[in-house]
Design a protein with these regions (language model features):
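Active-site proximal loop and beta-alpha junction motif in alpha/beta enzyme cores
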Residues: 1-73, 79-265
Length: 265
């Protein structure tokens, strides 16, 4: 069995930046253990699998796997999946994906790239001393939590975000959490870094789902709904951000870097 495969850098303007994702269209779902084995073989932060949506609720069903596990939401691999579908049909301007735990997601073509609509995840203030300690943050300005397993830790400035040197083993022992460190930025309205060692991703390069948590917080801080963001990983990536009620809209571009087939014996 041969499966079409593309590796796409999302939230990127050139190769080797943004966040790489595998995109693999299927005619029907393979067994869960096969999907996980493929994602492990790809060894990318995420591999996105899609099949035509027989329910008619959306164009495709969409699932995401890291090398370690299936996840409930992945923004950058959804943007990459939209790029894959819309790039194959220049007459098409929008594609919808039905997900198992995050509702229906939309990717639309814009004049400069793509717009991805995700649910807005409103985090609430909560003491997170173990997570802050694992991140080597002695005195965070604020700590917030969303029950999807996302921690948002606010620090004083962009330099502090860039200087973070986490204890990844300590973070791993805390379980399936996504740890976001964020601050007001100089290169953008706000900057972030994201650490997810439980999912075999020590530091995620550019994380769409993390912005579903960060955007509502920063919209309240800035008193406006439209912002710019930069994820200050080694690869780095710019994200346009807008809070739209119970949703967030992320804008960015994608670059296809590999196309081929994945062979299953």
């Amino acid at each position: 069995m041969k499966i079409p495969f593309a590796q796409i850098d999302a939230f990127a303007t050139r190769p080797f930046t943004g966040n790489p994702a595998g995109v693999m269209p299927l005619d029907a779902w393979l067994d869960d253990d096969v999907l996980q084995a493929i994602a492990q073989e790809n060894n990318l932060p995420e591999t996105a699998f899609n099949v035509p949506d027989a329910s008619g609720a959306a164009d495709y069903e969409l699932r995401w796997h890291t090398p370690a596990a299936e996840v409930a939401l992945c923004g950058h691999a959804t943007l990459a999946s939209g790029h894959y579908v819309l790039g194959a049909d220049p007459t098409r301007d929008k594609v919808t994906f039905r997900t198992r735990k995050s509702g229906i997601l939309t990717v639309e073509r814009t004049t400069t790239g793509y717009a991805l609509t995700l649910p807005a995840w409103f985090a609430v203030p909560k003491p997170l001393p173990d997570i802050a300690a694992a991140l080597a943050i002695a005195a965070p300005l604020a700590t917030l939590w969303h029950d999807s397993g996302y921690a948002l830790i606010i620090v004083e400035d962009e330099a502090a975000v860039r200087a973070i040197r986490p204890d990844l083993y300590a973070l791993l022992k805390l379980g399936p959490i996504v740890a976001i460190v964020s601050a007001r930025g100089t290169t953008a309205d706000f900057v972030s870094r994201v650490f997810t060692p439980y999912f075999d991703i020590p530091e995620d390069p550019v994380t769409g789902s993390a912005h579903a948590v960060a955007i509502p917080y920063w919209a309240a801080q800035f008193g406006r709904d439209t912002m710019t963001a930069y994820q200050a990983s080694a690869r780095g990536g710019h994200v346009g951000c807008r809070l739209a009620g119970e949703q967030v809209v992320l804008t960015g571009t994608c670059v296809s870097v590999i196309e081929g087939v994945f062979s299953l014996a």
